[in-house]
Each structure stands twice: as C-alpha cells, then as structure tokens.
C-alpha cells in the first residue's frame, strides 16, 4: 500500500509521496492524484524521487490538482525539505533539490525554518511564455488591468494596481484563459503596505486562488524592486503568515 504524508505551509495543503523509500509506478501517477482527491483537499501533490541531475540530492515532481505539472512551488519545496530532513533522506543541513526546470538550494537555519535560494529568473517575455507582440495588459469588465511578467522557474503575472478584492479570483482566471499566455500563468495581486512590506493574493495556474504561494512572493518582490516600488528584503504577507524575500 502506498504511504502518503499530508503537510501544510502557510495554508498551502500538500500531499507528499516519498518515491525514494518506496516504489511508485510513473504510469500510475495520474490515478494516484485522482485517488488522493477523493480523500483529501490539497493544492499540490509533491512526489520526491531520486535525482537525475548528478548535482542534486533529490528530485521533486509537482502535480497540480488538475493533473498538470508545475515547474516550481517554493512552499512545496519548504515542505519537502522538512520531510527530507525529518526522514533522513539527506544527512547535511542543506539540500539541493532538482525541479522541472531549475535547482533549488535549501538551508535549514532552525528546527522548522528554511532558506530557499533560487537563481533562475527572467523578465523576458519569451521566458514567461508570452508572445513578443502581446501587450502587458488586458481588459476585464471594461477596465484595463496592467501586469508585470516574470519567470521564477514558472510563469507569473504581477498586478500592482488597485483591484476590487472580490473580483480577484475572476480577474486571475480571465488572464489565465486569455490568449496572452500560451500555457497559463500564476497571477499575483499586490497591495503595498510600505516600501519593504506587501500583502499578496495569488490565483495559481491549475489550482485557483490559494492561501499562499512562495514563488508568487518571489515574483512580486522581484517586480516591485525592479520598478522601484519596493526595497529588499521584502516581507510578503499571506492570510496565515509571511515569508521574507531577499532579491
């Protein structure tokens, strides 16, 4: 019988499956997601595997609830790091985790406190799966919504303008379903508290709005610092806690 672990980080709910300590048939992964959905509410399923990159300690495969693969999930990375250290999958206080398109370096600073280092990010349209001809704005119910694109291992669109909070899930879905992004996008809505603090809500690709999004926090901080709206480090507040992003 397949053993699974439920974990939570800042309100994000995860199913964690250790495919290092037990055998998991890759062909069965879609069925595993369906069976887990019958029993649990979760945002992503995290599958820990032996690495294929010789420099990595472990590999992480991230499934959204719709069965699609996500390139990155920093809160998921943090959860997997805690699991890996607790279950002695790694022997040091640091971990190099292989993701879909990048590597994440995690350092254990305290018992359940982790620092995640991501080096690969880009503001280029091509890196964000946007056609070069696309405008960085779209219409929603007669209002023009502007956004800033950034890729942090996965594509994000960051909105800084004032938005009706009740409309955020609809506006995020509208951009995801538009022809601007070819493969969907995570949409972050920023409310600036002060120069080094923001409140953030994120409508995630393949999931919908979640209580937190680690890669969304990085995307928002990067765009804010780039445009002179924020200073680094930036405190990013979610409904159930915060992360600190140093750009």
What label would you give each PLM region?
Residues 116, 148, 213:
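Beta-strand scaffold of nucleotide-dependent catalytic cores
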Residues 121-122, 129, 155, 182:
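Proline-rich low-complexity regions
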Residues 1-110, 157-247:
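A glycine-rich beta-to-alpha transition motif near the start of alpha/beta enzyme domains, typified by
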Residues 70, 119-120, 126, 160:
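Flexible, glycine/proline-enriched loop segments at strand-loop-helix junctions
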Residues 112-119:
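Short, solvent-exposed secondary-structure boundary/capping segments
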Residues 137-164:
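Internal active-site segments that recognize and position negatively charged phosphoryl groups
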Residues 122-146, 168:
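Active-site glycine-rich loop that binds ribose-phosphate moieties when present
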């Amino acid at each position: 019988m397949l053993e699974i672990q439920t974990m939570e980080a800042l309100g994000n709910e995860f199913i964690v499956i250790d495919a290092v300590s037990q055998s998991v048939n890759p062909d069965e992964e879609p069925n595993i997601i369906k069976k887990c959905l019958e029993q649990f509410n979760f945002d992503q399923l995290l599958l820990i595997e032996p690495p294929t990159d010789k420099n990595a300690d472990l590999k992480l495969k991230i499934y959204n609830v719709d069965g699609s693969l996500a390139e990155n999930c920093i809160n998921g990375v943090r959860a997997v790091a805690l699991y890996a250290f607790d279950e002695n999958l790694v022997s040091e206080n640091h971990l190099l985790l292989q993701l879909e398109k990048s590597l994440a370096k995690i350092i254990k600073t305290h018992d359940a406190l982790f620092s995640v280092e991501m080096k690969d990010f880009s503001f280029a349209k091509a890196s964000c799966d946007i056609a070069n001809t696309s405008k960085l704005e779209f219409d929603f119910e007669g209002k023009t919504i502007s956004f800033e694109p950034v890729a942090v291992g996965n594509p994000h669109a960051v909105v800084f303008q004032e938005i009706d909070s009740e409309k955020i899930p609809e506006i995020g879905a509208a951009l995801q379903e538009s022809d601007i992004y070819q493969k969907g996008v995570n949409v972050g809505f920023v409310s600036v508290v002060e120069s080094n603090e923001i409140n953030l809500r994120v409508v995630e690709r393949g999931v919908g709005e979640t209580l937190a999004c680690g890669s969304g926090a990085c995307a928002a901080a990067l765009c804010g610092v780039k445009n002179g709206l924020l200073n680094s480090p930036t405190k990013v507040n979610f409904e159930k806690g915060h992360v600190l992003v140093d750009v």
